Amino acid sequence: MLNELLEVAARASNTGNMQLYSVVITRDKANKEKLAPAHFNQPMITAAPVVLTFCADANRFVKWAELRDAVAGFDNFQTFIASTIDAMLFAQSFCTAAEEKGLGICYLGTTAYNADKIIDALSLPRLVVPIVTVTVGYPDGMPEQVERLPLGAVVHQEVYTDYTPASIDALYHDKEELEVNKQFVRENDKETLAQVFTDVRYTKANNEYFSDVLLKVLKGQGFL
């Protein structure tokens, strides 16, 4: 079934039909254990039967161009952005197809934090950068859907309408009033839900540190 789902995902839109992406499939227990530290040892890496690492990949296209006497100017940030978009479209198309077949998936954003370690673990060559990891398996049950902001929070008509304090209050009201989120605030000894995100989960110091790591990765992999 995995190849069938990947075939469906490969029909996703992409930049110039160049398909500047690739995916590394990890099933082997030892290889999953090698990946786990890069994902802060989150248990789904070793517990899931399949781990997929979706990559921005200009390597394959550049090698094809070289073999056909074409000069590909793809060692730049623009190509990294294009290939990142391609990889994410491929990944999301896969996830949609997988869930339609009754599979469970989990996105792992830790891929971007420790891209350097994942590059080593997966032997990724120049012009290939891991973007997102997805674990796949059959769920034990059907979990409740995680809350989302109302559509009005993300949709703008004709032009972008900036948010006022009143509109922010209205858009985040239901999210802040959920008991699970109130518990989240209490457990982290914070005053507001926003503080949990800014002071605990996604701190300025961590954002800056991992930004430096990713910039070094892009330079090392030939995109900067």
What are these language model-derived features?
Residues M1-L224:
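Acidic, surface-exposed loops and disordered segments
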